[in-house]
Amino acid sequence: MELTSRERGRGQPLPWELRLGLLLSVLAATLAQAPAPDVPGCSRGSCYPATGDLLVGRADRLTASSTCGLNGPQPYCIVSHLQDEKKCFLCDSRRPFSARDNPHSHRIQNVVTSFAPQRRAAWWQSENGIPAVTIQLDLEAEFHFTHLIMTFKTFRPAAMLVERSADFGRTWHVYRYFSYDCGADFPGVPLAPPRHWDDVVCESRYSEIEPSTEGEVIYRVLDPAIPIPDPYSSRIQNLLKITNLRVNLTRLHTLGDNLLDPRREIREKYYYALYELVVRGNCFCYGHASECAPAPGAPAHAEGMVHGACICKHNTRGLNCEQCQDFYRDLPWRPAEDGHSHACRKCECHGHTHSCHFDMAVYLASGNVSGGVCDGCQHNTAGRHCELCRPFFYRDPTKDLRDPAVCRSCDCDPMGSQDGGRCDSHDDPALGLVSGQCRCKEHVVGTRCQQCRDGFFGLSISDRLGCRRCQCNARGTVPGSTPCDPNSGSCYCKRLVTGRGCDRCLPGHWGLSHDLLGCRPCDCDVGGALDPQCDEGTGQCHCRQHMVGRRCEQVQPGYFRPFLDHLIWEAEDTRGQVLDVVERLVTPGETPSWTGSGFVRLQEGQTLEFLVASVPKAMDYDLLLRLEPQVPEQWAELELIVQRPGPVPAHSLCGHLVPKDDRIQGTLQPHARYLIFPNPVCLEPGISYKLHLKLVRTGGSAQPETPYSGPGLLIDSLVLLPRVLVLEMFSGGDAAALERQATFERYQCHEEGLVPSKTSPSEACAPLLISLSTLIYNGALPCQCNPQGSLSSECNPHGGQCLCKPGVVGRRCDLCAPGYYGFGPTGCQACQCSHEGALSSLCEKTSGQCLCRTGAFGLRCDRCQRGQWGFPSCRPCVCNGHADECNTHTGACLGCRDHTGGEHCERCIAGFHGDPRLPYGGQCRPCPCPEGPGSQRHFATSCHQDEYSQQIVCHCRAGYTGLRCEACAPGHFGDPSRPGGRCQLCECSGNIDPMDPDACDPHTGQCLRCLHHTEGPHCAHCKPGFHGQAARQSCHRCTCNLLGTNPQQCPSPDQCHCDPSSGQCPCLPNVQGPSCDRCAPNFWNLTSGHGCQPCACHPSRARGPTCNEFTGQCHCRAGFGGRTCSECQELHWGDPGLQCHACDCDSRGIDTPQCHRFTGHCSCRPGVSGVRCDQCARGFSGIFPACHPCHACFGDWDRVVQDLAARTQRLEQRAQELQQTGVLGAFESSFWHMQEKLGIVQGIVGARNTSAASTAQLVEATEELRREIGEATEHLTQLEADLTDVQDENFNANHALSGLERDRLALNLTLRQLDQHLDLLKHSNFLGAYDSIRHAHSQSAEAERRANTSALAVPSPVSNSASARHRTEALMDAQKEDFNSKHMANQRALGKLSAHTHTLSLTDINELVCGAPGDAPCATSPCGGAGCRDEDGQPRCGGLSCNGAAATADLALGRARHTQAELQRALAEGGSILSRVAETRRQASEAQQRAQAALDKANASRGQVEQANQELQELIQSVKDFLNQEGADPDSIEMVATRVLELSIPASAEQIQHLAGAIAERVRSLADVDAILARTVGDVRRAEQLLQDARRARSWAEDEKQKAETVQAALEEAQRAQGIAQGAIRGAVADTRDTEQTLYQVQERMAGAERALSSAGERARQLDALLEALKLKRAGNSLAASTAEETAGSAQGRAQEAEQLLRGPLGDQYQTVKALAERKAQGVLAAQARAEQLRDEARDLLQAAQDKLQRLQELEGTYEENERALESKAAQLDGLEARMRSVLQAINLQVQIYNTCQ
């Protein structure tokens, strides 16, 4: 606590800070006159000048904003020293203070400390009543400020603050706030004491109203009580540094009278008066000076003055040593510290300059070592320390760095050196620098960089690299060191290279390379290239058209080089008399010795005319005639005449000819097969010639005189062979031409054109032949392969032979070979003429029509005529007058009419009755059930006429009943009486009695009598309170725990609603389990009836989030306790996060050993109190622990004490209000009243016309005011006395309240413990839980007794259930292998079907219809196809030379008309079959539904048995678990066992055994159904296979149908032929799509069969596919037979024609043709047999399907009986199941209750 001046005057010593400051001030004043030497301390670290009063010598720099008497005398009064008589004085500060002349001057300069004898005679005083006054000190430099002492003459200020500025008043910062009421004067400012050395706080201890005089205000910048981590830190220095100091006085202390009386006299005693102001500090030199000198303009000889100009050390300068001296800037300026002077260091410039500056970036880059940068380096030096030489100078290594001549000029050629002649400035081995070394440009060398490198030329100063690189191609330059001239840059080239850069080959050469000569010759092909020149880079020669390869020696793909005999004319194509053409068949595997289709027989005197349209080149051609002699040694003389279109121009190549040159004679030698006429013929391109060949005479022996009577000469062709030796490639005269000619003759390359058969030319001839061909034909010729007859657009590059399709010949593959016809997109087809019915194996080239014998018919002469069968022995068809034709092979009638069917139309079809074999009367008539077939009201499968009653008996379809099948059967609904009406199966999910006529509504089909606990319009939902799958008859009652189930979902205690599918009960919050019988994880207290509560275990103090399900106790870690483990462990208290303490309780006085877990207060028994329960409580007496209740009167006194405590509390509240409002707050109403009176007085005084009455009123009011003020003063005095008494009473009351507070805490602890117990009791539902436990205990014992009885009896329900389960498992194992085998069989069938689908293609269909396979684009296919359209957008199919339906129009007109009628009949029959198949499908669907329902019921019954068994096992396991629990005491075990033994099963052991046997028997009977249906799997697979065969037959028949329709239209009108064919293809495409869709359906059904092998109902669905196969097979067989019959008829017609031709010149080939026809007939018979086999298989399959359907109906009746028996047994099982559930529920409840008891 600070001491006042008065107290110090009474002998108290001064504070040590002030004494030290005074001592330093005196010492500084003493030493200020002479400069002091450097203090040794400055060299070791920081040093500081002496501290003194900064006001000494600076009185003129001290100002005040308010001073009394500056403008004249001003009165003022004092409130202290009341013992003096004079209390008011005058202030006159117009002149400075003088004790003798002007003692009443109170300027601010009076506060400066002086050592005058009467220093209290002078002070500074402000003007009266001004609260805001400022005192400011403006210093001339920066100073260290340590503390401030202010000694006041009057009251200290009620509020003030001290501010500082370190920038000469530009910005200000607050040091400290002082206030009597900090919250009111400086809101938001923290209160003292400060916690940190730079905290700005508000302090109140220097603002009290006492003492009234000589009160002090002391402020230290650095509080000694607060530790300072670093006194030399910049923040500390900035806090001490000031240039200005300002004291703001903001509020005066008053006595409150100024609020009542605004007169000037009242304010005269309220002002600021200051005796002394001491500002302690020293000169601020940053630790670089120990003394200071007067600053400029400051007094130099003021005694005791602290000067402001530092006498700097450490190489610093400036007013405050804030800078380094010049040339001492190698380190950054820093304030000195203790032990470290941070002196400025001299720059190192090596004597080359005397100026430097500091660079922070340089300093940081050097690692804080050096930051000085030299300025203005001399002597050609540079660098931060002048340690480098300037550019174009280098350091002389022989001289010292400080030598002025250390840097020398560089000697480098500026043209070849870098940077214009700069050299290395110094030596640096690491960087490869050599002082003075020139740095040449990249392409320059030399010591001075004066010459170009090897391979470069043209040294230049403007070139960045110095020299230019020699532009010499290394491949064309002579190897050596210098590739070019260093001055001109010209390169030295190799022998075959030219150019400035040796980068080009000489003409005729290419491929610049590193070879010795540099380039290679072009070597262009003499014929394939246009000239001998080639590309220099690639060597590519300039090729003739369609020649490729670098040398132009190869033929472009799609083109060929012609053979020498390319110019060939066939004799078959010549003109002349009637030509005798002889066609030859090519033997497979042999090469023909002729060209074309054969020969022309030429007799003596006959002439052939060859038309030569053009030749490729004007030159001489040799005439080559190819022929074949007819007899050995045949010779001939021939003459050939050239007929030109006009005279030959004389200037043309052939202008030298004379007319006799065009007539040439030739003689054929014996055994020769060709003839070369002796003289050539000259021909020119672009001119047509006629060559006439005449056979002058011929003979068969060597003697021409012998007459010859044999056959003529067979002429094959005429060939023009160019005379190639006259070409320039042979006749050029150069060495190469001579070599080529010699090679051509040596290897006889000309023989290539002599014979038709070609072999590969030799290696020597091949290039010459290619060159010859390209010369003659100016390149290669296009292949022009016929797109329909060839397999590729490319041909053999030698000769141009295209790759032909089967049966196609010709170089371009554009002709059919002999024995083939119908040239088209697929090539040509073999004639295949029947050897029995045809005259020859050759046929017509376009239609393929063979020459038939008499009686044969058809395209191949291989069948009978229409209406007959059995080729070649044809017989009439037998069809009972109901069909016009039959199968040509089997005789089966085709297209039976009049509703008949059978092989001979001998029976009525389904839906009709009668005998079609009778000639009249018993024809087939429709069955009236109730209407005939084809109508919408026909509901019978068939009918018959009763032999006795002659009535029609209808066989109704399933779902119909009545004499005429006019009503719906039970279990069905609908209205069959109306058109389109039908009966449908009631969809009741198998939950009705199908024999009950009232089970469903007969009109709407709504289910009315649902069974098996189901409901809904389709019995598809379980009733409320039940759950399961209604479709499987497995609805079970909901089993819900009442404690965990939402009570709103339980209408009664024994019935609750649950999820109808899963059986999940509606649980309360945080309850789980299907029966809502357990809390969710981390929850507890199920017995509350409101859901489970969270465990809320502490996350880190509990072992896990789980807790006891019944008590909620978490599993605590060691050291923790409480229910949630958030408290200390048992018998401990405290905060477990900090520290736990053991309960320190006196065992003699506690109620429970556990103390309060947070306060540690022990829980005392009645009459005991204290924190440890070790003393008697209030109201008890005696010595602990013998505490006895006090006398009865204690209660009365205790009430009095409590009343006093209440009064004390009220007084305390009143005192707190007075503290907040002040003393004046109690007189607020009186003050208001006084102010009103004063207002009246002021009004009267202020009035101008004042009367006597008003004056009297004024006097009265004044007196009243004085009286009231006096009363208020007395009241205030009384209140002050009362306040003192109240404070004493308050102290006593506080002491009493402390005891009451301890009692209150003990009571609160007891109350909280009681609340906890009460909450536990509330949450535990104690009464209800107790009743539930007691009731459950009895039930559990009963359940235990019954369970033991059921489990231990022999036989028991448990053993019976296990036996039934074992039998069921054995039965399933027995059926396992059968199931697997069926599954594998279906997998194999599915694989076969999938493989077959991949083989299907539209190519054959398109080929048969349009004549093209349809696999080529429409633009390139001449016959069109599916989806093709012509230029007009019309569909395009067929055409000329197309082997499709259009091409055979002239052969099938009659067949087409007959086919149309038959197709109409077949469509009618197909419609009837379709209706029957639809009915069969519906029956199969209904049978499947019934079978599925039966299987579902059987599975449901089995599921119920298994579920009962499972629940019984769970029951037994629950009992075992309970008995094995650790907390189960013997009494509980005995009780549970008794309860279980008391349980009884509502059926005897014998009854359960009998019931299980009956169920097993029914299950075995149901297994027979699976076995029977399993046997149908083979039939299903067989039906699927037949379906595929029938579809293939149908596809073939549909193609024939479309072909016939196209034939009919084409014969009627040729213009419409293409349109009708397009219609046919549209139908074929539609049928194809149908076929694909059917195949897709088949795949889907097979996949469905695989998925449903375990369901007997799914197998019944396969009957649909079986019947569909029958329908398709029937239609396909009919169409196939019709087509076969037509083919036979056509064959018969052709046979008759062939018979006529047989008598002609073809008789010698009859046997060959007959053998071929027999082979074809065998193929037809095989197809007929296959069709008959398919028909028989289809008939057998239909019969088998009907038998299976009848068997299923019988099984259905048997199944219904079994179902009723199962329902009866199921009812008994339901009873057992309900009883078992109740037992299980009782046991579970008992287990929960016993667990809770535990």
Swiss-Prot record:
Domain Laminin N-terminal, chain residue ranges per copy: 43-282
Residues in Laminin IV type B domain copies: 561-777
Region named Domain II: 1190-1409
A cellular component annotation (GO) from this entry: synaptic cleft
Pfam family, one: EGF_laminin
Chain's role: Binding to cells via a high affinity receptor, laminin is thought to mediate the attachment, migration and organization of cells into tissues during embryonic development by interacting with other extracellular matrix components.
Name of the protein this chain belongs to: Laminin subunit beta-2
Organism the protein comes from: Homo sapiens
